[in-house]
A protein has these predicted regions:
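Basic nucleic-acid-binding alpha-helical/helix-turn surface characteristic of O6-alkylguanine DNA
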Residues: 1-54, 92, 100-104
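Short amphipathic alpha-helical/adjacent loop interface patches that line ligand
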Residues: 28, 63, 67, 91
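Short, proline-centered helix/strand-breaking motifs
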Residues: 36-37, 67-73
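Regulatory, non-catalytic segments
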Residues: 54-66
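Intrinsically disordered, low-complexity basic tails/linkers immediately adjacent to helix-turn-helix/homeobox/MYB/SANT
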Residues: 75-92
């Protein structure tokens, strides 16, 4: 059987849990780990960055299922108009996380 080598998990993420993700989720989570602290990128930017420019909504769905927050910083992804968009902890928590990163 041919095995495709999957990218290694981000620092602090269990390899066993990482293997339970889809390839798409892994790509999304690796991409958002590269967003610098205190900065944001849009769902569309993430989709473009992983080579799937029409998948912005799917990126949002993957982030909604992120079991590794805040190690995988989904709070750094916002809507294309710059508004916060969704976040499991609510928009106020997302805003506070971003503000804390900007001040650090």
């Amino acid at each position: 059987m041919n095995r495709v080598k999957m990218p290694a998990p981000p620092a602090g993420v269990s390899a066993i849990a990482w293997e339970g993700l889809t390839r798409f989720q892994q790509q999304v989570y690796r991409a958002i780990c590269r967003i610098p602290k205190g900065q944001t990128r849009s769902y569309g930017w993430v989709a473009q960055h992983i080579g799937k420019p029409a998948a912005a909504r799917a990126v949002g769905n993957a982030l909604n299922r992120n079991p590794f927050a805040p190690l995988v910083p989904c709070h750094r992804v916002v809507r294309s108009d710059g508004s916060l968009g969704g976040f499991a902890g609510g928009p106020e928590k997302k805003r506070r996380l971003l503000e804390a990163e900007r001040q650090a």
